[in-house]
Amino acid sequence: MADKPIAKAAHSVLVLHGPNLNLLGTREPEIYGATTLADINAALAERASASGVSLAHFQSNHEGALVDRIQAAKSEGIAFIIINPAAYTHTSVALRDALAGVAIPYIEVHLSNVHRREPFRHHSYLADQAVGVICGLGWRGYLAALDYIVSQHGGG
């Protein structure tokens, strides 16, 4: 079965990191690994550059700031979003509504396998509207999302 084409080529990708991801590398490394957020962003930037894709990234511990950044993405011509909503995955109708409101396709990413964790982490308010969900691959899940975007929807 062929993937549903997305009208716009993915020349511009926004990566959104939710709450507490600024603590990566030191926060519960047995769950989230030792890789820092700066390391993840650098790996993504290198992969994006090699693929001819413009990449921006943003992290916030505040739901409203993430909503504002999603809304701004529309006027910036962002073609695709990679989002790790972190704890907001399980609570935020606001993020879901913002993503629906801008109608930019997105992939949801989680470092850990949320389905092997506490039951409250099994539900996502974003997953049913996402192009895909990647979880449990550690920081490499972000690269998998970017690789999918480039391979299926075009680079620069």
UniProtKB/Swiss-Prot annotation:
One example GO MF annotation: 3-dehydroquinate dehydratase activity
Reaction(s) this enzyme catalyzes, per UniProt: 3-dehydroquinate = 3-dehydroshikimate + H2O
Gene3D superfamilies associated with the record: Dehydroquinase, class II
Broad enzyme group: lyase
SUPFAM superfamilies: Type II 3-dehydroquinate dehydratase
Keywords assigned by UniProt, alphabetized: Amino-acid biosynthesis, Aromatic amino acid biosynthesis, Lyase
Enzyme Commission identifier(s): 4.2.1.10
Residues reported to bind substrate: N84, H90, D97, L111, S112, R121
Cited InterPro entries: DHquinase_II, DHquinase_II_CS, DHquinase_II_sf
One Pfam family named in its UniProt record: DHquinase_II
Pathway field: Metabolic intermediate biosynthesis; chorismate biosynthesis; chorismate from D-erythrose 4-phosphate and phosphoenolpyruvate: step 3/7
The UniProt record lists the keyword Acyltransferase: no
Function: Catalyzes a trans-dehydration via an enolate intermediate.
Family according to the record: Belongs to the type-II 3-dehydroquinase family.
Subunit annotation: Homododecamer.
Descriptive protein name: 3-dehydroquinate dehydratase 1
Recorded name of the encoding gene: aroQ1
